[in-house]
UniProtKB/Swiss-Prot annotation:
The lineage of its organism: Viruses, Adnaviria, Zilligvirae, Taleaviricota, Tokiviricetes. Keywords: Host membrane, Membrane, Transmembrane, Transmembrane helix. The chain crosses the membrane at residues 9-29, 32-52. It is a multi-pass membrane protein. It comes from Acidianus filamentous virus 1 (isolate United States/Yellowstone). This is Putative transmembrane protein ORF63. Residues 30-31 are cytoplasmic. It is found in: Host membrane. The keyword Plastid does not apply. Residues 1-8, 53-63 are extracellular. GO terms for cellular component: host cell membrane; membrane. It comes from the Viruses.
Length: 63
């Protein structure tokens, strides 16, 4: 079961990373998107999820 759980974590990490990259790209192309409150909330949430996931993986591997 551990292997399946790891696979799901990797898939979710990749999806979050791809979505965050696309949203950051669109933000550079059209900076007026930052005026949209929900766009900013979603972008911050995706980046936060990536940071927490990375920290969780580092914590699991060190201990």
């Amino acid at each position: 079961m551990q292997s399946g759980n790891f696979t799901l974590e990797v898939i979710m990490y990749l999806i979050n990373s791809i979505l965050a990259f696309i949203m950051i790209f669109f933000t550079f192309v059209n900076p007026s998107l930052l005026k949209c409150q929900y766009w900013t909330y979603i972008l911050v949430a995706l980046i936060t999820a990536i940071i927490f996931h990375t920290g969780s993986k580092v914590g699991k591997s060190s201990g």
